[in-house]
Regions:
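N-terminal, active-site-proximal structural segment of metallo-dependent hydrolase catalytic domains
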Residues: 1-43, 55, 60-63
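Short catalytic/ligand-binding loop motif for oxyanion handling, primarily in non-cytosolic enzymes
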Residues: 12-14, 35-38, 103-106, 141-145, ...
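Structured beta-strand-rich core segments of catalytic domains in phosphoester-bond hydrolases
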Residues: 32-103
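Metal-dependent phosphoesterases centered on the DNase I-like endonuclease/exonuclease/phosphatase
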Residues: 114-194, 198
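Surface polyanion/phosphate-binding segment centered on an Asp-His-Pro turn
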Residues: 218-229
Length: 229
């Protein structure tokens, strides 16, 4: 089973079409438009969530999981209070797509590492029941600007995930230190000189393969991730 995570930056029709041509069984897509505007083929199902952004009166920026119809389902314990986290069961695997994002409404703005850790704690009881993949744009990196003493940065998020039995595929594969990655996944305002590692895939089981796509500047300010299980 092939899982691809790709923050596509702007939800343009040609980008969605390109995603679908990747042949993934499951797509985790931050910054995608709502289902009624995505116009997916009937062979696919899509779950979309997020605080609504409006652009020409349309919801255009949320998190989605897309999967082949009949080959997965959203769990009954999906909790929409976490605006940008979706749990999918596919072939008895738990695929938790996440995109920790600060709400645009009047709620207090939590730091990204806090949002990520709250999502992890919400779904952690199910990590023991399923072979689990947590994947997406974590919006977290080492020494980020909104770190706090309590919630830290990506190092703290990683500590919490490892305490639940999950490990970063990239860091397992490369044995590189967090914050010293040789491949980066996010290019702020499309500048290579201002880049970070903030897209992650964590599992509690061995996978067949993991890779980070080369950066496609036309597609996004992020790179995509591919996991085959």
């Amino acid at each position: 089973m092939k899982i691809v995570s790709y923050n596509i930056n702007d939800s343009l029709p040609w980008k969605i079409e390109k995603l679908l041509k990747m042949g993934a069984d499951v797509l985790v897509v931050p910054e995608i438009t709502c289902p009624e505007d995505a116009h997916l083929p009937e062979t696919l199902d899509m779950k979309w969530c997020g605080i609504e952004y409006f652009h020409h009166q349309k919801k255009w920026k949320g998190l989605s999981i897309i999967w082949k119809r009949g080959q997965g389902y959203i769990t009954e314990w999906f909790n929409p209070k976490h605006d940008y986290a979706i749990p999918l069961i596919a072939n008895d695997y738990l695929i938790l797509g996440i995109w920790p994002t600060k709400p645009t409404d009047d709620r207090p703005k939590k730091p990204y590492p806090q949002i990520a850790q709250e999502i992890i704690q919400e779904y952690a009881p199910y990590f023991k029941e399923y072979k689990t993949l947590v994947i997406g744009d974590f919006n977290c990196y080492v020494n980020q600007y909104d770190r706090t003493k309590k919630y830290g940065d990506m190092l703290k998020v990683n500590e919490v995930l490892e305490s639940k039995g999950l490990h970063s595929l990239y860091h397992q594969q490369t044995d590189e230190e967090f914050g010293k990655e040789s491949i980066l996944t996010y290019f702020h305002r499309f500048h290579e000189s201002d880049s970070y590692f903030r897209d992650y895939a964590y599992t509690n089981f061995p996978v067949i393969s993991f890779c980070i796509f080369p950066w496609d500047k036309e597609m996004s300010d992020h790179t995509g991730l591919e996991v085959i299980i």
